Amino acid sequence: MRGQEDGFLAPLCYAPLGVSASRRLPVYYLPMARDLASLVDTLAEIVGPRHVRTALPERLTYAKDGLPTHRRVPGVVVLPGNRDEVIAIVRLLGALGMPFVPRGAGTGLSGGALADGDAVLIVLTRLNRILKIDARNRLAVVEPGVVNVRLSLAAAPHGLQYTPDPSSQTACTIGGNVAENAGGPHCLKYGVTATHVLALEVALADGRVVELGSPGGEPWGPDLVGLFVGSEGNFGVATRITVRLLPVARAVRTLLADFTSLRTAGEAVSAVIASGIVPAALEMMDQSCIRAVEDSVYAAGYPRDAAAVLLAELDGGHEAAVTADAETIEAVLRAHGARAVRVAADAQQRERLWLGRKKAFGAMGRLSRDLVVQDAVVPRSTLPDVLETIARIAAEYGLTVSNVFHAGDGNLHPNISFDGRTPGLRERVEAASAEIMATCIAAGGTITGEHGIGLDKLRYMPLLFDGDSLAAMRAVRRVWDPEERVNPGKVVPVHACREWSGVRNAEWGVRSGTSPVDSALRTPHSALDAEAGVR
């Protein structure tokens, strides 16, 4: 190996972007780490012993994300405190050829930030500084561990906000939002994370640091920011993120409409969008979800007897215009079957209505000890039929499905509550989940809107993409990470679908041939087989 001397690598120096070689940062000597102890010692030299976790109870803390289905115990957990430490860690692991997984707050819902025992988990929550708020240019520069809602709170004195608002915004980080291209209720009008990221500083798999995009937001050349956002940690580690801030709306109107059937509520969604007025948000909850919320500490005053409610919000810069739009939407809702429409009288009522929606996932924890959280997107016009089909699937499998989702853009979240200790129940849940995903795809939809592929959706990828398409995705990944060491085993299934199907079915406990997914997974994809060297 070039630079190797007596079991050590030559010293590695690096300079941050914009820093001349004469001002290089302190040098790290990187031992070959022939065993865990030497790796841990070197990591401790970089971040300090307190920030390297090797004890099993500590590592178990990071074995899951917000989705309890998957469990992976990392070999080592390291918590850098600044971007220089991140770069040093990534360079160390690159020199050693070791896999690693970047992780934020662990609120993800796809198993995307889990690391196997042979991988190092790099937890970025200590990189939590808001480096700059530029009110004049309406942008902010943040580290990846900044909690989403903190940025809006910091921007509020300037009359600005960061508009992507996932339900977990009080806990999730901007870096995690970038990895998943997170959305939220208000992405209907304002767009998902990709709409708001202007520039990124990224540590690649080998520790090289690159800048993507520009604070001015004017694109030139390939859209590498757009490629990185939503890459689920496969391309590198974002160490600094420049985002767009928008003015806080001067006028807001929030409406709650209730319906006696899911179909009617679904039809009303299309009618609202067809009116020509795009709400800031348009959310739906079904009766199961409504009752879970109303039985919890997050009770929002939703009508318990409603089959579904729509939560619609209009906002803008002029009170009269927003009021007129709200009146139009109220009329549309009533004309399309709303039993009643309530308008929040003040900010307190509005906050209460939104608290129930934002905390709905937590409230569903009351229903049973286990919860499968699904994420799919369908065309709005198909919502009535898809919702009815999901209800039929749940009934056939004897399961409870609670729907809470971003209705305005057709981003479904059918959630299945169950007790995994009941013999055979987990298998029924997974079979029902597969049928729900197949239903969404058949309706012209896709398998994720904002939660990502991660581990959870790997087995569905061949339903959407043939072998050539999957091989192309893998080729793009290899441009960023030739050895596929960054967050390995996520997003793109790298083995032949025939072989990979058996592994995944064994893990999920799904019997071959029990769902539409199994048949699809047995379809050979020659391009991917050749790519993986499978014979």
Each predicted region: which residue ranges?
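N-terminal flexible segment immediately upstream of the FAD-binding catalytic core
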Residues: Y28-R91, G108-R138, S167, Q287-A299, ...
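Intrinsic disorder/low-complexity segments
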Residues: M1-P31, E499-R535
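Activity-critical C-terminal alpha-helical subdomain
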Residues: R208, L458-W500
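Alpha-helix capping/hinge segments and adjacent helical runs
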Residues: P49, I441-I453, R477-R478, P482-V486
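A glycine- and small-aliphatic-rich helix-loop capping segment at beta-alpha/alpha-beta transitions
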Residues: S110-N128, A156-L160, G183-A194, T242-P247, ...
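C-terminal substrate-recognition/cap domain of FAD-linked oxidoreductases
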Residues: R53-A63, V243-P247, R253, D258-A432, ...
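FAD-binding subdomain of flavoenzyme oxidoreductases
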Residues: R129-E283
